[in-house]
């Protein structure tokens, strides 16, 4: 699963020598080289009998914690020219934004945000898409595609300007269609993406002390958010 690969590739820099980092690089090439003609990416690949797009896992893969983390920590950006056009097609042709510039939730082949219950898919989608744009912008700058970088930056500004007003209910981030308990995963992603203003951190800390829905996969981001918050409180 590429969601797991995203978490594992960052761990590899702490436990494996540089030869081990090549595993993630190979995975990146495989994922993008098997991109479907319409632009969708999916995993596991290659596969003869089961290959499905889990939209949020794919956003995680191409984004800040996935492809960008691999490039930054290995200091090897050699894969970027090979995957950039496919990444751009996925983020801007497969994915769509609404009139306010916010990403539209997609079902893909399997609409999956995490194990368990109380998954706020809309907030998670917005955060993962924002982080994917953040990575894409860095790659555009690396390739000196300044027009692309400026366009991506404008998209990020629009999302950042709308996020708090759309999802903050006075106590936590929730989408209007989410009927379950407040999703700790969504709060975590709001923090680590940078979309949650620092002024919300104290309230979010209360949410993290109450809500425990994340699986080990998403708990990584809950823990990271807690570290970021506790640097201030």
Provide a role label for each language-model segment:
Residues 2-232:
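Active-site core of glycosidic bond-cleaving carbohydrate-active enzymes
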């Amino acid at each position: 699963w590429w969601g797991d690969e995203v978490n594992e590739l960052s761990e590899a820099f702490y436990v494996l020598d540089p030869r081990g980092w090549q595993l993630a690089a190979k995975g990146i090439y495989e994922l993008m080289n098997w991109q479907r003609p319409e632009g969708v990416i999916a995993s596991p690949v290659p596969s003869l009998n089961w290959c499905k797009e889990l939209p949020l896992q794919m956003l995680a893969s191409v984004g800040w914690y996935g492809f960008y983390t691999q490039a930054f920590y290995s200091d090897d950006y050699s894969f970027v020219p090979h995957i950039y056009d496919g990444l751009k097609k996925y983020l801007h042709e497969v994915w769509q934004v609404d009139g306010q510039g916010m990403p539209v939730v997609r079902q893909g082949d399997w609409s999956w945000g995490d194990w368990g219950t109380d998954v706020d898919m809309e907030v998670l989608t917005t955060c993962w898409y924002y982080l994917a744009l953040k990575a894409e912008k860095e790659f555009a700058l690396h390739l000196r595609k300044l027009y692309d970088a400026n366009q991506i930056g404008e998209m990020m500004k629009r999302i950042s300007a709308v996020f708090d007003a759309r999802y903050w209910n006075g106590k936590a981030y929730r989408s209007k269609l989410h009927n379950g308990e407040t999703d700790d995963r969504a709060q975590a992603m709001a923090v680590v993406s940078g979309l949650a203003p620092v002024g919300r951190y104290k309230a979010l800390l209360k949410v993290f002390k109450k809500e425990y829905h994340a699986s080990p996969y998403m708990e990584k981001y809950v823990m990271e958010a807690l570290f970021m918050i506790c640097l201030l409180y």
